[in-house]
C-alpha cells in the first residue's frame, strides 16, 4: 500500500508541486478532510452565535470578548511546535528502523547457492528448504505484527494452503512445547539444521562456508526479532496522548479566541465584513499545518498497519519466497561463458543516448585540486613543524633544529634559469622564525658562546683524530654535563654540538661559501 510519487518530483518545478498536491491516495487531504470539515462547521457555528443579536446581547458579547482576549494571549503557552517536533522525530526514527529490519533473503540465497553445491534432488531440496524456512519465520512474525498479513493468514492451515509450510512441518511445529510463547525460532532452527546435514554429507566444502551461511541466517533472525520488539514495546502511551490532546485542545480554544476582531486591543472604528474572514482563514491554514503535522505522526506510528503509506508486508513475503527459490534453484550454476568484453584492448569509453550525450558531467575532483599555489621563489624550503618556539630552551644544544631535517625542492619553471642560492630570497616563514627567536633573551648568550668563523674552518679542515681536548676547551664554550665535567664527552660528539651552536639559525649555505670552504680544505691538506 505504499504510494509512489518519485516520478512526479523528478524535477523541481511548479508543475511538480501541483502534481504532488493534487494526489489523493496517501495525501494529507485524505487524512485531514473529515476533521477539517468538522472544524470549519464548528467555527462558522460559533461565529454565527457570537454575531447574532438574537442569541447573545451586547453585555454578553463584552464578556465573550474578554474571555477571547485571555485565550488569545495565553494560547501560546501550549508548546505545539516543540511537542510535535520531538514526537515526529521519534516516530520517523522508529519508522526507519522498522523498514531497515523488514528482512530480505537475497544475500542468504546467493550464499546458499554458491556454497551448497550439487544438482541432485537432495541438494536442491536442502537449498530450497533453507530459504523457505526463513520466509516461514518471517510469515509467523508478520502474522502477529501486521493486520494485513493476519487477514491473509487467519489460521495456521491457511499458511499450509498458501505453500509456505507443509503439513508434516505444521505437525512438527505444533509439537514444539514452549507454552504460550511464540515459536518464531523453530523455522530458523530447521534452516541451520539443514546446513549441518549438508556439511556432514559433503555438500558444503568447508566448515568456514557453513558458518558463513549460518551468519546470514542469524542476521535475518535478528532483524525479525527487532521487528517483533518494536511491535511489542511501542512509544509510551502518555506521549502520543499528550500530543494529540494538546493539538485538539489548542484548536478548541481557537474557536472562542478567533471570533472577536480587535486591532491593537480595540474594536475597529469602521467595521467591515472582511475583518472576520481574516482570523477564519488564518485559523484554517494553521489547522491544516499543525493537525497535518500530527497526522504525519499518526500515519507513521505503526507502519505495519493498513494505511495507504504502510509497508507492503504481503508483497514482501511473496517476493522473498519467489526470488529466494529462483536464486537457489532455477538460476543455480547458470553463469555465462567468460568472453572478452567490449573494451578489451581499447580505451574504456561508455556510450550515451543522444538525449544524454550532451549533458555536462561533474566528475569527482577534489575542491582544492584546481587551486594554484603561487610560489614567488625558485625553490621551496621544507622544515619540520614547530608547535611553539617560545617553549624551546636555546641553552641546550639538543633542542636546536638539525640541518638534515631541512629539504630544498626546486621549482621547475617553463622559462628562465634557476637563480643561485646567494641571490635567492629567504622564505617568509624562516624570517618570522628568526624574528621570534631574536626576541628571546638567550640570543645574546648564544652569540657570546659562538666561536669565530676561522675556528670553524680550522675544525672542519682537521681530521677528527687531530682534534684534542685542549683545543676544544679553548674554542668551544664551556658547558657542564650531567656530571659537571667536559672530559666525559667524546671528541666527535663535542664537534657536532659545536657546529650546531656556531650556526643556530643558519638554514643553509650559499654556493659561493661552499666553494670557499672546499678550497680551504684542499689547501690545508
Curated annotation (Swiss-Prot):
Keywords: Cell membrane, Chloride, Chloride channel, Ion channel, Ion transport, Membrane, Transmembrane, Transmembrane helix, Transport. The keyword Transmembrane helix applies. The keyword Cell membrane applies. It is found in: Cell membrane. It is a multi-pass membrane protein. One of its GO terms (molecular function) is chloride channel activity. Disulfide bonds: none annotated. It comes from the Eukaryota. The chain crosses the membrane at residues 36-56, 71-91, 237-257, 273-293. Its main location: membrane. PANTHER family: BESTROPHIN (PTHR10736), BESTROPHIN HOMOLOG-RELATED (PTHR10736:SF63). Forms oligomers. Belongs to the anion channel-forming bestrophin (TC 1.A.46) family. Calcium-sensitive chloride channel subfamily. This is Bestrophin homolog 15. It comes from Caenorhabditis elegans. The lineage of its organism: Eukaryota, Metazoa, Ecdysozoa, Nematoda, Chromadorea. The gene is best-15.
Amino acid at each position: 500500500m505504499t504510494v509512489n510519487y518519485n516520478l512526479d518530483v523528478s524535477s523541481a518545478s511548479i508543475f511538480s508541486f501541483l502534481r504532488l498536491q493534487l494526489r489523493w491516495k496517501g495525501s494529507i487531504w485524505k487524512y485531514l478532510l473529515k476533521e477539517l470539515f468538522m472544524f470549519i462547521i464548528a467555527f462558522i457555528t460559533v461565529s454565527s452565535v457570537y454575531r447574532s443579536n438574537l442569541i447573545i446581547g451586547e453585555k454578553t458579547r463584552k464578556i465573550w470578548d474578554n474571555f477571547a482576549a485571555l485565550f488569545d494571549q495565553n494560547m501560546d503557552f501550549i508548546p505545539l511546535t516543540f511537542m510535535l517536533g520531538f514526537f515526529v522525530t521519534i516516530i520517523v526514527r522508529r519508522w526507519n528502523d522498522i523498514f531497515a529490519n523488514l528482512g530480505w533473503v537475497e544475500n542468504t540465497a546467493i550464499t546458499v547457492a554458491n556454497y551448497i553445491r550439487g544438482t541432485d534432488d537432495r541438494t536442491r531440496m536442502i537449498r530450497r528448504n533453507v530459504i523457505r524456512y526463513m520466509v516461514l519465520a518471517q510469515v509467523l512474525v508478520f502474522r502477529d505484527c501486521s493486520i494485513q498479513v493476519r487477514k491473509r493468514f487467519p489460521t495456521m492451515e491457511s499458511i499450509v494452503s498458501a505453500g509456505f509450510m507443509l503439513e508434516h512441518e505444521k505437525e512438527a511445529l505444533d509439537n514444539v512445547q514452549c507454552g504460550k510463547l511464540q515459536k518464531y525460532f523453530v523455522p530458523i532452527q530447521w534452516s541451520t539444521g539443514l546446513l549441518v546435514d549438508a556439511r556432514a554429507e559433503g555438500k558444503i566444502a568447508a566448515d568456514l562456508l557453513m558458518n558463513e551461511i549460518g551468519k546470514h541466517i542469524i542476521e535475518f533472525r535478528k532483524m525479525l526479532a527487532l521487528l517483533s520488539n518494536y511491535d511489542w514495546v511501542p512509544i509510551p502511551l502518555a506521549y502520543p496522548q499528550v500530543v494529540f490532546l494538546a493539538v485538539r485542545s489548542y484548536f478548541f480554544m481557537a474557536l472562542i479566541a478567533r471570533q472577536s476582531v480587535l486591532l491593537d486591543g480595540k474594536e475597529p472604528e469602521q467595521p467591515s465584513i472582511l475583518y472576520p474572514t481574516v482570523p477564519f482563514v488564518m485559523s484554517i491554514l494553521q489547522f491544516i499545518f499543525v493537525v497535518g503535522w500530527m497526522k504525519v505522526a499518526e500515519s507513521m506510528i505503526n507502519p505495519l498497519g493498513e494505511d495507504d503509506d504502510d509497508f507492503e508486508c504481503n508483497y514482501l513475503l511473496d517476493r522473498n519466497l519467489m526470488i529466494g527459490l529462483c536464486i537457489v534453484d532455477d538460476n543455480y550454476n547458470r553463469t555465462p561463458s567468460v568472453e572478452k568484453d567490449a573494451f578489451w584492448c581499447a580505451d574504456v569509453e561508455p556510450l550515451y543516448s543522444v538525449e544524454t550525450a550532451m549533458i555536462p558531467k561533474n566528475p569527482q575532483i577534489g575542491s582544492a585540486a584546481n587551486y594554484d599555489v603561487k610560489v614567488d621563489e625558485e625553490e621551496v624550503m621544507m622544515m619540520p613543524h614547530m608547535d611553539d618556539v617560545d617553549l624551546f630552551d636555546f641553552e641546550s644544544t639538543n633542542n636546536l633544529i638539525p640541518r638534515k631535517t631541512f629539504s630544498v625542492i626546486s621549482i621547475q619553471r617553463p622559462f628562465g634559469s634557476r637563480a643561485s642560492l646567494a641571490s635567492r630570497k629567504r622564505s617568509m616563514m624562516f624570517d618570522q622564525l628568526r624574528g621570534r627567536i631574536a626576541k628571546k633573551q638567550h640570543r645574546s648568550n648564544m652569540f657570546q658562546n659562538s666561536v669565530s668563523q676561522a675556528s670553524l674552518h680550522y675544525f672542519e679542515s682537521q681530521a677528527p683524530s687531530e682534534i684534542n681536548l685542549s683545543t676544544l676547551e679553548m674554542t668551544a664554550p664551556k658547558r657542564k654535563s650531567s656530571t659537571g665535567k667536559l672530559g666525559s664527552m667524546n671528541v666527535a660528539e663535542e664537534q657536532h654540538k659545536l657546529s650546531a651552536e656556531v650556526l643556530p639559525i643558519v638554514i643553509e649555505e650559499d654556493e659561493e661559501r661552499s666553494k670557499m670552504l672546499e678550497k680551504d680544505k684542499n689547501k690545508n691538506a
